[in-house]
């Protein structure tokens, strides 16, 4: 018998099939570097920096930039930003630099060059006969990297916001230690011609390398980071939200997880804390894993850990936090159940769950719980089984324990209390809800609740 086959009838005809499904569509890639080789890219021939500067600057003024030339120039210009490594720098077993070493952004990565010449079509700027100064190079590098940040701003009605951000960044690169090299609004005009450049792997890679360098090295031109800072923890919104959440509620990650009372958290918690990653290591390649090409499908994004993401932002909504009210709900990750969990969580100022305990301190606690469940003995009801949880204030340490919180939810039938709903409605009443946001979900779901 083939254990992989299933047999059935279709119109009285016996059919035998071996069900096979797409697998790689769902596979997340962890960023850990196992071969101890630095992240790398391949670019064209190393350009003459004077020629490249003139070509790129004239292209910027004409709002016509070649991404290959821009990447080649950005990589070549890395030698201009030398700094001193403050401590021994190691990540994933790779020795990046020793304390006191002179390093540049190029030290962090491997950049391979071919013999392919760039276009370097000097359509303008021929009046620049002298060599560009380092401040001029720094200004051009900074403006080019700002294109990355601008291309990451997406969504409706972002026109004015994007223009304001572009103007502020432009101002940075026309004041000391930088120098003005383009006219006002040039950056925004250029961006419109390069609106999707954040999707270009080599450009994203170089932005990440510059950011990783300036994030650690004290440097005269560290303000270049204004355009690259969005590469830090990119596609990591799920893990970043969880980190901010446990800081807000003043619990350790281990303590907070004990309040995640829903089965669907299991896979996500396992995914977020995969062994061998450097999630807690400062200045690790992990921080820039997306831009450096170490992961195609992030296991730490909001979609990868959607239940955790939904829960945390429902708690934020309960607290009236604008960021949470504006965040986009992951519709496929039980938003109704997560809103119940978030209501209790918010009331207690930390974790609350829905329907069942799923995480335990150790194996014995898990076994004790399963034994109690199997015999239908709900031992957790013993301490406050007579409490009317809608009228009682719970602020003692005992009532904030995972056992007490879980009991309270079960006593209310896994539903929000009237006080939770009133709180949700009140904190979002004066907020202009964005489409598909948590605020819109709460308005639609609870504003007309008869309770």
UniProtKB/Swiss-Prot annotation:
Positions of post-translational Phosphoserine modification: 389
InterPro entries, A to Z: Rhabdo_ncapsid, Rhabdovirus_ncapsid_C, Rhabdovirus_ncapsid_N, Rhabdovirus_nucleoprotein-like
Protein name: Nucleoprotein
Subunit structure, as described in the record: Homomultimerizes to form the nucleocapsid. Binds to viral genomic RNA.
GO CC terms: helical viral capsid; host cell cytoplasm; ribonucleoprotein complex; viral nucleocapsid
Processing after translation: Phosphorylated by host.
Main location: virion
Statement: the UniProt record of this protein carries the keyword Hydrolase: no
Subcellular location(s) per record: Virion; Host cytoplasm
Keywords: Capsid protein, Helical capsid protein, Host cytoplasm, Phosphoprotein, Ribonucleoprotein, RNA-binding, Superantigen, Viral nucleoprotein, Virion
A UniProt-annotated Pfam family: Rhabdo_ncap
Biological role stated in the UniProt entry: Encapsidates the genome, protecting it from nucleases. If expressed without protein P it binds non-specifically RNA and therefore can bind it's own mRNA. Interaction with protein P abolishes any non-specific RNA binding, and prevents phosphorylation. The soluble N-P complex encapsidates specifically the genomic RNA, with protein N protecting the genome like a pearl necklace. The encapsidated genomic RNA is termed the nucleocapsid (NC) and serves as template for viral transcription and replication. Protein N binds protein P in the NC through a different interaction, and can be phosphorylated.
Annotated family: Belongs to the lyssavirus nucleocapsid protein family.
Molecular-function GO terms, alphabetical: RNA binding
Keyword Isomerase: no
